[in-house]
Structures are given as C-alpha cells and as structure tokens.
Amino acid sequence: MSTPPLPDELRRVHMVGIGGAGMSGIARILLDRGAMVSGSDAKESRAVVALRARGAAIRIGHDASSLDLLPGGPTAVVTTHAAIPKTNPELVEARRRAIPIVLRPVVLAKLMAGHTTLMVTGTHGKTTTTSMLIVALQHCGFDPSFAVGGDLGEAGTNAHHGSGECFVAEADESDGSLLEYTPDVAVVTNIEADHLDFFGSAEAYTAVFDAFVERLTPGGALIACVDDPGSAALAERTAALGVRVLRYGSAGGRDLAGALVGWEQQGTGAVAHIQLAGESAPRAMRLSVPGRHMALNALGALLAALQVGADPDTVLDGLAGFEGVRRRFELVGTATGVRVFDDYAHHPTEVAATLAALRAVTDQAGDGRAVVVFQPHLYSRTETFAREFGAALSAADLVFVLDVYGAREQPIAGVSGASIVEHVGVPVTYVPDFSAVAAQVAGAVRPGDVVVTMGAGDVTMLGPEIIAALQARANRTVPGAGAR
C-alpha cells in the first residue's frame, strides 16, 4: 500500500522517556517513516542504543536544552507518556516555548491513519495476543505495521513500519488512553478490576472498554473472550448496540466463532483443539508456549487474522512457530538441573495463569517443584489484592516474596511484601533485601525444580543472578573447582 505522508507536526519530534516499551516503538516507526527524532531517558538501555543506531539523537538525563538536539530548526512537537511528571524540565521548557505536548497514544493514532487497524486490549494477555496476531499475519505475507508492549521473540523488536495495509497495536487501558483509537477490529481478552489508582472504581474501569468498542469503525467487529465474565458482559452490551460481535472461549451454550474444545500440555508447549464456526471438524492448533490461557490468546488472534482475509491453515502454521514475547514465561537459562523462567505477571489472575502453566511443566518433568520469586508491583495494587495474591501464589510449592516495587507510587503505611506473605498457604519466605534474593533461592532449590521470577518491576534482573548463584554453588561443591 501507499503509506500516507507524515503529518507536518510529526516530522520533527522530541520524545521524553524514549527508552520505554511503548515510546521506543513509536520512535522506531517515526524513524522508519522519515521523521527526525530526538529524545531523553533516565538511563541507557538496549532500546536507547538501538534507536541511536537508527539515527535518533538521545540524551541520558532530563534537561531543558534537550529540546535543541535536532539540527536545522526547532522541535515541532514533544511527546511523552502518562507516567512522566508535568514538572519534567523538558515539558516545562516545551510549555514555555509553546511547543505542543501530546501523549504517546495521540501519536500512535496518527501513525495508524489510512491503515486497517486491529487492536488488542484487556486486563491480561494483550501483549501476547497482539504479538501472536502480528506473527500470524507476517506468516501469511501481510507485512503489517505494528506497535506492541514487548519485544517479539522472532523479530526482536516492539514495532515495525510495514508495507501492508494492516496496522496491529496493543491498546493500553491503564490510563484511559485507548479512547484515542478508532479500530476496525478490536480484541478484548478479559476485563477485571485493575488500575484503580487511576480509575477510582471497578465500574469506571469497565466503562472505558464500553467506550472503546463504541469507537469501532462502521462495519467493525468486536472479538471477545466469553470465558471471562467481564468480557462476556461487554460482548452482550456491544451486540445490543448492533455491532458485530465474535465470541470465543470454551464456555458451553454460546454461539462461538471459535471454541477451545480441548487442550494438552506437551513439554513447554501445547496442542489445542479448536472448532471454528461453520466448519464440520475441529482443528489442531500447536503452540510453543505453555498454558491454557495461551491457547485462548492464540484463538483470539486467529479470529482477528481471519477478519482481514488471512488463510486459517497459514495462520495456524504461524502460531505454531510463535516463540513468545520477552518476559512472558521466557526461559532465562538452566543451571545444575534447575530451569529459570521470567514472567511479567503482576495481577492475581495473571499470577494464577502463569502458575498453572508452570505447574503443567513441572508435572510433566517429574518430581521437580514449582518455585516462585514474586515482586509485588505498586503499593495500591498490593493493598487491594494482598489476599488474592496470596491465594494465587499458593499454587506453587515454594514461594519467595520480595518487597514492593513502587514505580510511580509513594509507599503506603503498613503495605509491603509481608502483606502478601501472611496469605500464602505453602512454604514462603519474605526477602525484603533485593541483593540477598539470588543466593537464598539458589540455596533452596534442587535439580529438577523450575523457578519463575515474576512481576512488572526489576525482579527481571534476578533470573541471570539466580543462574550465576547456582553455578557458583556447584563449583564450590566440586573438589578443586576454580583452582589454577
């Protein structure tokens, strides 16, 4: 297709927080479409290095003078994301100079103009489902543009400017910004109260999904997972508005466009048996990622791909090769017979789904234990869901709970990782000292165990440290190990 020209205001862009998952993706697409891009971030990262290699001018640290990084004239627009405070010196300087400041979703919406847009949202699973859809369409030869909240294993990137008509993107609901978009196809994986620090109530959180699907283009479609009560209710309300709704899931008694009729764990992958509406026999859907929740995500991605004319057999071939998304049950490595995974789960439902997949892996492997290293994310979420986190973590055999990763929040009196520990029903250790975690875990596990580090904060750094600690312990037990 012929890509529409960039709007003038996006030809010279300064991005505050350019290294973040969402912002770096937008920067990649802008650069690929010929924009001049500058930016700043608090620290160096793989994303920052990659963007510099593509031509972006990036400064580490935040300073008003960063608005002048681009040669040949002033910055036309400054873009940022909701987590950056308004007191940031670059935003203060932009207001002083009367340079427009827009949030990331506004820029993404402009970049999607002229494309057939497929968007995935929901409380859980949106990054993985979006990524599955991207891989499926790529396998079908569509070359979609895309922006997603995690790096695809196959592509090693979170965004791409493609030559095809489709644009696939993840719609983040956490701050209501998904209302900037007008999708042609919307996939909703589930709806469960979250981000109450922003929305204030479960009702307000749910309402943003209704408002989102009301923005579907004429003739557009909602694809909703009806195994989830919140998404199923949204499907009913949306259908009542006359919008085309395609339901998927395993719930009986439903008019399903796609049904998950069976699922079998196979190592760290699975085979799902699915029934598509109008077909006489079920199909086998092979996946390289574990967990029933992954099979449902893949089914939603399949239905979305079919809406733009993809061949179902080719889509299934593509899904079989899907390697996963960084930090979604990602294998970090193996040492002394212990496998270590890393996962982004930071809500009780996500924790439960990941542990179900982990349990399936350990059950197949033999007598190894499921070991979880969990870092709560946000004080408000920990306070609200402490009991639910404890119940979800109790599906493991051994649990280590770290202190809260506060991110954008200030501490709340009386709220810590210990708030969760008291609700865990299996052996659990509270480790508030981050530097002590790897050694404690390495000292507690044995060959055959499977460890998963879990959370949305810097717990992801612990996987390599645990592997190193295991290797160090093994070396100490071998006579003469390390001798010169």
UniProtKB/Swiss-Prot annotation:
UniProt enzyme class: ligase
E.C. numbers: 6.3.2.8
Molecular function via GO: ATP binding; UDP-N-acetylmuramate-L-alanine ligase activity
One GO term describing the cellular component: cytoplasm
Assigned keywords, A-Z: ATP-binding, Cell cycle, Cell division, Cell shape, Cell wall biogenesis/degradation, Cytoplasm, Ligase, Nucleotide-binding, Peptidoglycan synthesis
Record InterPro entries: Mur-like_cat_sf, Mur_ligase_C, Mur_ligase_C_dom_sf, Mur_ligase_cen, Mur_ligase_N, MurCDEF_pg_biosynth, UDP-N-AcMur_Ala_ligase_MurC
Reactions catalysed according to its record: UDP-N-acetyl-alpha-D-muramate + L-alanine + ATP = UDP-N-acetyl-alpha-D-muramoyl-L-alanine + ADP + phosphate + H(+)
Coiled coil: none
Pathway: Cell wall biogenesis; peptidoglycan biosynthesis
Primary role: Cell wall formation.
Family from the record: Belongs to the MurCDEF family.
This protein's name: UDP-N-acetylmuramate--L-alanine ligase
Organism, as annotated: Mycobacterium sp. (strain KMS)
Gene that encodes it: murC
